[in-house]
């Protein structure tokens, strides 16, 4: 009997997963719009989502080129703690980057004044370094230092974790950001300064039983979304997971067979690449096919520079179908048209991709809300299944 009890406890321990609840909040874009600042922001900042994946120049060893405009539309945020005792921060869990950074008490910029700031002197486990970090965006850059401390995430105590502490945050637009910092979940190969990403550090310490994490994004206005470290919860999806090999280990990049509408190819006719990115809100692709899609769905530009459609037309619009590894993944108009403040905004966004990189798409939250997603580091693959 004792052995049966022991075996049962071992089996239970192997099934333990760590969930981080995500809360859906108003995006930075919406905050700027409500304060009458969006048009001016878009005018001053040459916003190209591709800059997240294709920095204009190779960065020095301790520089992280991570344009912050890419988080303009983010709505899902979770809480982590850093230090002993823990200091709480609201962060984006971003599979499109690999570094962790938060504001620090050394930052006196306007953008830092209304956000949580890490104080190293209040943590008994903080270790300083001589490293620096610079996170470029728009016309300025966020600069800071690198340090080590314990990170609390989903009930996990991730010790000796390297992270960035911002010292300057130029640009008043970050004042309206609904998040404090970023927690990157991509591969270590794209991590600035060779810093070990949070999930890698967690796995290396044996704090999760499986070398994978998964994401469920709810369409609910407030709650229900989660990041799951070390496991998969089948209650979040229907059917079975379909697995797609990672084509390039850096971002969570996969191969796409085609993108169709009404049975006809509208992009990616010869196959293309896509990055599955929780740190991008929209469905993003090369400028030309995106322009064609906007035209096909009847989208036109409003005074804020957003592409909008008639809300009454949504029910008559077709699905956009991504065929990946032989499986069709339809995205219905109810998913790719975003309703906000009485407007219906297209969930597609164009980006200027370097021509030598081929046709690249970003499958952001518009896609992930439809499909429970598993990021499997052990087997370098992505699992997809329709959400429950």
Curated annotation (Swiss-Prot):
* Top-level EC class: hydrolase
The chain residues annotated with the modification Phosphoserine are 130
What are the cysteine partners in each disulfide bond? 107-112, 268-272, 311-344
* InterPro entries linked: Aspartic_peptidase_A1, Aspartic_peptidase_AS, Aspartic_peptidase_N, Pepsin_A, PEPTIDASE_A1, Peptidase_aspartic_dom_sf
Q: Where in the cell is it found?
A: Secreted
Post-translational modification (record): Each pepsinogen is converted to corresponding pepsin at pH 2.0 in part as a result of the release of a 47 AA activation segment and in part as a result of stepwise proteolytic cleavage via an intermediate form(s).
User: Got a GO cellular component term for this one?
Assistant: extracellular exosome
Q: Which residues form the propeptide?
A: 16-40, 41-62
Q: What is its EC number?
A: 3.4.23.1
User: Secretion signal: which residues?
Assistant: 1-15
Looking up Gene3D superfamilies in the UniProt record yields: 6.10.140.60, Acid Proteases
- What keywords does the record list, in alphabetical order? Aspartyl protease, Digestion, Disulfide bond, Hydrolase, Phosphoprotein, Protease, Secreted, Signal, Zymogen
- What are the catalytic residues? 94, 277
Q: Which CDD domains match?
A: pepsin_A
Q: Name one GO biological process term.
A: digestion
Q: Where's the Peptidase A1 domain?
A: 76-385
Which family is this sequence assigned to?
Answer: Belongs to the peptidase A1 family.
PANTHER family with a match to the protein in the record: BETA-SITE APP-CLEAVING ENZYME, ISOFORM A-RELATED (PTHR47966), PEPSIN A-3-RELATED (PTHR47966:SF22)
Question: Could you tell me what this protein does?
Answer: Shows particularly broad specificity; although bonds involving phenylalanine and leucine are preferred, many others are also cleaved to some extent.
Miscellaneous note of the record:
The expression of pepsinogen genes is regulated by hormones and related substances.
Q: What is this protein called?
A: Pepsin A-2/A-3
């Amino acid at each position: 009997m004792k052995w049966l009890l022991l075996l049962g406890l071992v089996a239970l321990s192997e099934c333990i997963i760590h969930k981080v609840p995500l809360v859906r909040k108003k995006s930075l874009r919406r905050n700027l719009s409500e304060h009458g600042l969006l048009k001016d922001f878009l005018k001053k900042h040459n916003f190209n989502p591709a800059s997240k994946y294709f920095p204009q120049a190779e960065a020095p060893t301790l520089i992280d080129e991570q344009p912050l405009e890419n988080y303009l539309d983010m709505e899902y945020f979770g809480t982590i703690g850093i230090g002993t005792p823990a200091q709480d921060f609201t962060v984006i869990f971003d599979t499109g980057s690999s570094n962790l950074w938060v504001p620090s008490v050394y930052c006196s910029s306007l953008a830092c004044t209304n956000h949580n700031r890490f104080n190293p002197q209040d943590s008994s486990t903080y270790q300083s370094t001589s490293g620096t970090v610079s996170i470029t965006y728009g016309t300025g850059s966020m600069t800071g230092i690198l340090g080590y401390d314990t990170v609390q995430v989903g009930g996990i105590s991730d010790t000796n974790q390297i992270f960035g502490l911002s010292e300057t945050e130029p640009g008043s637009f970050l004042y309206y950001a609904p998040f404090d910092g970023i927690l990157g979940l991509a591969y270590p190969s794209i991590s600035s300064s060779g810093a070990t990403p949070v999930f890698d550090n967690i796995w290396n310490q044996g704090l999760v039983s499986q070398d994978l994490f998964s994401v469920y994004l709810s369409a609910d206005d407030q709650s229900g979304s989660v990041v799951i470290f070390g496991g998969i919860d089948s209650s979040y999806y229907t059917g079975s997971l379909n697995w797609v090999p990672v084509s390039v280990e850096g971002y969570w990049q996969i191969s796409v067979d085609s993108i169709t509408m009404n049975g006809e190819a509208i992009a990616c006719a010869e196959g293309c690449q896509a990055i599955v990115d929780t740190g991008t809100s929209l469905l993003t692709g090369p400028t030309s096919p995106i322009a064609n899609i906007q035209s096909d769905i009847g989208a036109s530009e409003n005074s804020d520079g957003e592409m909008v459609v008639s809300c009454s037309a949504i029910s008559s619009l077709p699905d956009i179908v991504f065929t990946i590894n032989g499986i069709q993944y339809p995205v219905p108009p109810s998913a790719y048209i975003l309703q906000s403040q009485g407007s219906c905004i297209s969930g597609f966004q164009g980006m200027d991709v370097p021509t030598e990189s081929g046709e690249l798409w970003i499958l952001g939250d518009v896609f992930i809300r439809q499909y429970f997603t598993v990021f499997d580091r052990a087997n370098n693959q992505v699992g997809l299944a329709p959400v429950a």
